[in-house]
A protein has these predicted regions:
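Residue register of alpha-helical TPR repeats
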Residues: 4, 24, 44, 85, ...
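"A position-specific structural signal for the A-helix of alpha-solenoid helical repeats
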Residues: 8, 41, 48, 82, ...
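Amphipathic alpha-helical segments of tetratricopeptide repeats
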Residues: 27-32, 67-75, 109-119
Length: 137
């Protein structure tokens, strides 16, 4: 299946609540895009795989994939919103793994990028998540 076909199937799985299937399909899409040397699309698909792994309860897998995406973006700076979204997924994975200090740092960094990109919902989510983490510290 092509990367594009995998993305279409992953979106369908996500809408149906089949998060583990969505994760696997996004991973397959990422592999396809990487093989085609479409690195921006690879990172984007892998970020989605990471998020759905976390949502499906597999925080180690989500964290591992999110770290790969953030490391790639730090070496090849993407558009601001792509980096903000990658940091958001990284922070979600860290929260799920109990790595709250790292999660706070990544939420703060994502917040600044969302602010710069003019994404008010991203700023609000980051503020809310940092407040929750501060309350449990």
């Amino acid at each position: 299946m092509s990367g594009d076909d995998c993305v279409i199937e992953a979106k369908s799985a996500r809408r149906q609540g089949r998060l583990s299937d969505a994760t696997a399909l996004y991973e397959e899409a990422a592999e396809s895009f990487q093989a085609e040397n479409q690195l921006a699309r690879w990172a984007h698909a892998l970020r989605h795989a990471a998020e759905f792994a976390v949502r499906a309860g597999d925080s180690p897998r989500g964290l591992r994939e999110a770290q790969i995406v953030v490391e790639y973006y730090r070496s090849s700076p993407p558009p601001t919103l792509e980096m903000a979204n990658a940091l958001r997924v990284m922070a979600l994975a860290e929260m799920a793994a109990g790595e709250n200090d790292s999660a706070v740092s990544h939420w703060i960094e994502a917040r600044e990028l969302y602010l710069h990109a003019g994404v008010a919902d991203g700023v609000l989510e980051a503020d809310r998540r940092v407040a929750v983490l501060a309350a449990v510290a």
